[in-house]
């Protein structure tokens, strides 16, 4: 049994002392691929410092963890560091799309909605994912570009979006028309 597996079992048994010992051994002895999986698990259950330590160790072999590191840095309020991690992901990487989406989110958090929109526009050139289109619609709405927001909302399947986000495109389109002074 790998140290990572022993750590997970110890966490499940609420034996954090043993979990910490197995964590340290895992960092020294377990294969990098296993560490990435452990990092993802630890991140998902809120053990962010441990996940971060793993990601820092493997980030040059697994550059996709830079997205995770950026999210952890943002959680800690270190937006500048988050951008540094995201900038380490090259445009030809499979993870570049994820990096753009996280960048858009960070710019949005910083109140730079125009820049966030630009990042989502770039992401929309790489993928037609409905959540990217939804993000663009929401940003256009927030910026007061209601006609553009309506066009984006109209591209979305209301049932799918409602199930994913709890947001009705019909309601958003209605609000956008109302903001334009068109009440019919």
Regions found by a protein language model. Give the residues of each.
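Start-of-helix register in tetratricopeptide repeats
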Residues: 1, 33, 64-67, 98, ...
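Canonical tetratricopeptide repeat
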Residues: 5, 37, 68-71, 102, ...
